[in-house]
Amino acid sequence: MIRRRYRGCTQGAWIVSVGMLFASCTSGAWKASVDPLGVVGSGADVYLYFPVAGNENLISRIIENHESKADIKKIVDRTTAVYGAFFARSKEFRLFGSGSYPYAFTNLIFSRSDGWASTKTEHGITYYESEHTDVSIPAPHFSCVIFGSSKRERMSKMLSRLVNPDRPQLPPRFEKECTSEGTSQTVALYIKNGGHFITKLLNFPQLNLPLGAMELYLTARRNEYLYTLSLQLGNAKINFPIQFLISRVLNAHIHVEGDRLIIEDGTISAERLASVISSLYSKKGSS
């Protein structure tokens, strides 16, 4: 009887200890409100909003050949939506993920033996650096990731924008998709140099089209994506040739509204879309 009571006490003490450990770990979590786009920052060449549900196959294809594929997948598996920015000059992606993360066990997940170096910001937020990728989980409901070249921004700088957000100015529809809070599965992209992206979509990567900013919205449908694209036209003298070229290559409804070329009901395979998106940050695509 005494032994049973002792065993019960030790088991209870163990449970309480673990609970206290977990509580003490989460007590230091970031509790203030967070602006995802303000954290990734302004001045990017590409912005994206990526709900994970319904788009898992596309995400797997995009990160398939990345050096930090396994580490990125750890984060994605716990993510409901990604807010991202790509910076061509420094060849880096900054990602803010909303979801459910193992905040209390980051030291076990991102261990020194696996090549991670642990550091803290002036606000006491822990982050982990490796050769290609830097990660921080400031709270159980969001994470921050930077991956890219050695010129990429330091994670401490990104985390400083939790306090002082640097929010980019983005189109109304893009903003609307970002605030859908998981109710939409639409992938949204805003690209500063629309000509660079559209030539890859047309499969004419060497063609230099004088085009402005582009908005792209994609919805998964079986193994392909249905998309709507809005492209700012540049030189009025060549607008018609550009419209003609695009209409000959893309199977979609195309028309002009003011200074914008609108492409609706276009389709693209998940494999092709992943290739085009990946080319935006690949060494070849971002040189």
From Swiss-Prot:
It is found in: Cell outer membrane. A lipid is attached at residue 25 (S-diacylglycerol cysteine). It is a lipid-anchor. Residues 270-279 are annotated as: Amphipathic helix 9. Disulfide bonds: none annotated. Residues 155-162 are annotated as: Amphipathic helix 5. It comes from the Bacteria. Residues 69-77 are annotated as: Amphipathic helix 3. Forms a U-shaped beta-half-barrel with a large hydrophobic cavity (3549 Angstroms(3)). The cavity is opened when amphipathic helices 2, 3 and 9 move away from helices 7 and 8. Has 5 potential amphipathic helices (P1 to P5, residues 56 to 63, 155 to 162, 194 to 202, 240 to 250, and 270 to 279 respectively); P2, P3 and P5 form helices in the presence of lipid vesicles. This is Outer membrane protein TP0453. It comes from Treponema pallidum (strain Nichols).
